Design a protein with these regions (language model features):
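Positively charged, low-complexity terminal tracts
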Residues: 25-238
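C-terminal motif of bacterial Sec signal peptides marking the signal peptidase cleavage site
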Residues: 21-23
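Bacterial N-terminal signal peptides that target proteins for export
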Residues: 2-13
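Sec-dependent, cleavable N-terminal signal peptides
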Residues: 17-18
Length: 238
């Protein structure tokens, strides 16, 4: 049997070496971090420097925010009736606005990115100017006579919006109903991405001049960004 004192001495030497190595490692690790408690009280509640910059396709890395309802009209024969769209959300991660509503038997979701909203707002402003000048053109409802035509994401389904496409054709055009001008957003049937021979439904959203004014105000980019200001502050404030 080996002497106990030799075992203790060897253990003591080994422990001392380990302690010295750990101490050195701890010092090296601490030196890797740049930290300081030298800050002023008035530096609280500032936006973290690491918060991502807003762009045309990105506002913040936060969840969707519900927006106030938007009012359109639906047409039956020569009569129009209100169509209230209450499920509207701003998607900060893509700077898109989603509109969810029922059209006939279908639940429908229309998604407009900022570039599309800008086109629609420009058409709205042109329509209002023509309305005020009493120069709204009396034209046949068609893509050819539209203020503009483009594509957007549109999804639909009887229960959920599981069918549709990212490039649904639509256009914006004036239409007279009972001798009064309205602004029409017409979604044309477009083949879906489901792989089947199915098409999106034909959908018409009408707006009176006052509803056009309200739509312009609600879809104003500054107002949309204001709606997430408090959430963004909570998400990124130090």
């Amino acid at each position: 049997m080996k002497p106990i004192m030799k075992k203790m001495t060897a253990s003591l030497i080994a422990s001392t070496i380990v302690f010295m190595l750990v101490s050195c490692a701890s010092k090296d690790s601490a030196d890797e971090y740049d930290f300081s408690y030298d800050y002023r009280d008035d530096e609280y509640e500032f936006i973290n420097d690491e918060a991502p910059e807003s762009t045309e396709d990105f506002l913040a890395d936060i969840d969707p925010v519900d927006l106030a309802p938007v009012y359109f009209l639906k047409k039956k024969g020569k009569k129009v009736s209100p169509r209230e769209v209450t499920k509207i959300a701003l998607i900060p991660r893509t700077n898109a606005v989603e509109f969810h509503f029922r059209d006939g038997a279908n639940e429908v979701a229309v998604i407009w990115r900022k570039a599309e909203r800008d086109k629609i707002l420009n058409a709205c402003k042109k329509f209002l100017q023509q309305y005020e000048d009493k120069t709204v053109p009396h034209v046949k409802i068609s893509k050819k006579n539209a203020y503009f035509s483009s594509k957007c994401s549109l999804w639909f389904g009887l229960i959920s919006t599981s069918n549709g496409c990212e490039n649904n054709s639509y256009y914006v055009v004036p239409e007279f109903i009972e001798k009064k001008p309205y602004l029409l957003i017409r979604f044309s049937p477009t083949q879906t991405t489901s792989g089947q021979d199915t098409y999106t439904p034909k959908i018409s959203l009408y707006m009176s001049p006052q509803q056009v004014r309200d739509f312009i105000e609600q879809m104003n980019q500054e107002k949309l960004e204001e709606s997430i200001k408090e959430n963004k502050k909570k998400a990124y404030t130090y």
